[in-house]
Curated annotation (Swiss-Prot):
It catalyses: 7-aminomethyl-7-carbaguanine + 2 NADP(+) = 7-cyano-7-deazaguanine + 2 NADPH + 3 H(+). Catalyzes the NADPH-dependent reduction of 7-cyano-7-deazaguanine (preQ0) to 7-aminomethyl-7-deazaguanine (preQ1). InterPro entries: GTP-CH-I_C/QueF, NADPH_dep_7-cyano-7-deazaG_red, QueF, QueF_N, QueF_type2. Substrate binds at I88, E89, S90, H229, E230. It comes from Escherichia fergusonii (strain ATCC 35469 / DSM 13698 / CCUG 18766 / IAM 14443 / JCM 21226 / LMG 7866 / NBRC 102419 / NCTC 12128 / CDC 0568-73). This is NADPH-dependent 7-cyano-7-deazaguanine reductase.
Length: 282
């Protein structure tokens, strides 16, 4: 259980509650969650964050009416800067997007600008939005996370509660290595509803070699952990940085979609460019 799971700031969220689905535009449906809720317990302050990054969202269920009333469909790509005061709560994002369904817009650019404006206001930070017609994305191959997969280890695990101590003494030798490690076994749970969140994670670092068994045990320990996607990625970054002390570190997770949305947060303290292609489970 997260230390802030019952925080007052979460009580007003529509997440986990019965809600009406509106099909006419309503920006008030968007709800933000303060990033400070998970950053404060990690000792992270807004003016001294050890990383940069973004939350990348893919919007698969986006539709509205053009000026003549003809339905339009698009795939949206949203990037929410890590410095924003709030992250966007995903159910509220879904409800907000539903409110476009029977709303007329003069152009695709009007839709894009509306999304960008409203998301910036909710997040209290920088947001960029791009919209794609379906034929622009057709035929794109399924992507994969570059790196060495650490999942096929012959180890026995019987503890699934979060424990950062798996990373204690997880480095060895004095030689500096550069590695990119990947796991598809990341599973955590929604902070509010405790529904499962499934993801793949890429960890790229430069530093003393990290023991892959200990790293995998650490990642599997998220299996009963309740936090939002973005919060899990920042926790993983912070734990590896603190306990393994790499010179450079990037953590990137791509989660399976829910409600027509997938969330793909990344955090890095070096020059890192995330690949944004859809993975096989997305």
């Amino acid at each position: 259980m997260s230390s802030y799971e019952n925080h007052q700031a979460l009580h007003s969220l529509t997440l986990g509650k019965s809600t009406d689905y509106r099909d006419t535009y309503d920006a008030s449906l968007l709800q933000g969650v303060p990033r400070s809720l998970n950053r404060d317990p990690l000792g992270l302050t807004a003016d001294n964050l050890p990383f940069h990054g973004a939350d990348i969202w893919t919007l698969y269920e986006l539709s509205w009416l053009n000026a003549k009333g003809l339905p339009q469909v698009a795939v949206g790509h949203v990037e929410l800067d890590y410095t924003s005061v709030n992250l966007i709560e995903s159910k509220s994002f879904k409800l907000y997007l539903n409110s476009f369904n029977q709303t007329r817009f003069d152009s695709w650019e009007d839709v894009r600008q509306t999304l960008e404006r409203d998301l910036r206001a909710c997040a209290q930070g920088e947001v960029s939005v791009a919209l794609y017609q379906l034929d622009e994305l057709e035929g794109q191959p399924i992507a994969h996370l570059h790196g060495t997969c650490i999942d096929n280890q012959d180890i026995e695990i019987d503890h699934y509660d979060f424990n950062a101590d798996y990373l204690q003494n997880a480095t060895s030798g004095e030689k500096v290595v550069e590695e990119t490690l990947v796991s598809h076994l990341l599973k955590s749970n929604c902070l509010i509803t405790h529904q499962p969140d499934w993801g793949s994670i890429q960890i790229q670092y430069r530093g003393r070699k990290i023991d892959r068994e200990k790293l995998l045990r650490y990642l599997v320990s998220f299996r009963h952990h309740n936090e939002f996607h973005e919060q899990c990625v920042e926790r993983i970054f912070s734990d590896i940085l603190r306990l393994c002390q790499p010179e450079e570190l990037s953590v990137y997770a791509r989660y399976t979609r829910r409600g027509g949305l997938d969330i793909n947060p990344w955090r890095s303290n070096c020059n890192f460019q995330p690949s944004t292609g859809r993975l096989v489970r997305q």
